[in-house]
């Protein structure tokens, strides 16, 4: 292969690596702020067992929410139901992330974002019982467990702790 082809492949790989959602969406140094992990849970309002397709992070109203990978803001939407105020980012390479129950937005549709940019703030909008962030990762159209994507933020010991905390079978906040 030519030198130019190798440079092009390297740039594509760098773009892909910066696009993968690889950090936590809120600052969470003590790892005590997850409320509910991915999987079946008792819905806090409907009181039925339901698949929780993301991870809930409890935090104070107004806490900053960060883009977990580079991408383009696909959706900025407000609703009194469901996800409430939410942002969806298309990261390319088959990845999308959803950030729900926000109090405020810090982005607009079509805006390019970088990993670590503030995209919004913790809220209690939509079908929610307390201030928190509901965070989802989608790969090739399928919801996947977000806990497997925090590798840029956590040491192996912290990662083990996060797995343990997120596997609790408590109620979700949405």
Q: Predicted regions span which residues?
A:
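Catalytic cores of peptidoglycan-degrading enzymes
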Residues: 26-172
